[in-house]
Amino acid sequence: MKIISYNLNGIRSAISKGLFDWLAEEQPDVFCIQESKAQPDQIDVMTMQELGYTSYIHSAEKKGYSGVAIFTRIQPDRVVVGMNNPKYDCQGRVIRADYGDVTVICVYIPSGEAEGPKYEYKMEFLEDFLVWIKELRKERPNIVVCGDYNIAHKPIDINNWKRQVGVSGFLPEEREWLDRWEASGMVDTFRMFDQSGEKYSWWSFRAGSRARNVGWRIDYHWVSEPLRERVVDAKILAEVVHSDHCPVSLEVRG
């Protein structure tokens, strides 16, 4: 099973930049997106269907904001929209699909700020999401949690880390949450295969950051420990450009 996760920063914008042609060539089994920034009737599900994908969409109530979706060539046994928590579900942040004994979760973690209401909301989301995943793993032990985490975990995951310590996305408490996430039995699949630096998945639009590779690695496929032995490969597809993020891919057996 090949799973690609991609923060599109607006699906309609990404389509105008050739998303469908790339998708037809890449042909992931499961395509998870974040920041669709679209309502269901604004997403071209007919073209997705022509490409072989069934669409499962979770949009934010606020138009042009947030939103996640799973497009799948494999028929899922079950799809669950949201976390059963209106505080987060109104923003379209989580969608889940079950395939046999494997569960795929697509998440768009809030971007937050260094302080204030957005900071509080992000930290509350992180704690509630961790609890929700722990409970889900009792029922579904083999899980993939892919998406935009809006946190760079370690200094190797961010350009010029010393300048970023007080910046949202690299705050000590955010990174500590990822430490606890990992300690709970979650595996950063990219780091199973690549321990090198300067591997990023997001670049600011400002000052030619992408051309200079001044970026952050904030898009991940984490898997639960029991699924580790079935991970075949994990990559960052940095050459693919439809967004300020790039796609990340994962291959798992069965």
What is each residue range found by the language model?
Residues 73, 97-100, 224-225, 250-254:
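Active-site beta-strand termini and strand-to-loop segments that position acidic
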Residues 37, 44-112:
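Structured beta-strand-rich core segments of catalytic domains in phosphoester-bond hydrolases
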Residues 1-50, 54, 60, 65-66:
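N-terminal, active-site-proximal structural segment of metallo-dependent hydrolase catalytic domains
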Residues 1-9, 101-113, 146:
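Active-site-proximal beta-strand elements of phosphoester/diester hydrolases
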Residues 51-54, 127-214, 218:
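Metal-dependent phosphoesterases centered on the DNase I-like endonuclease/exonuclease/phosphatase
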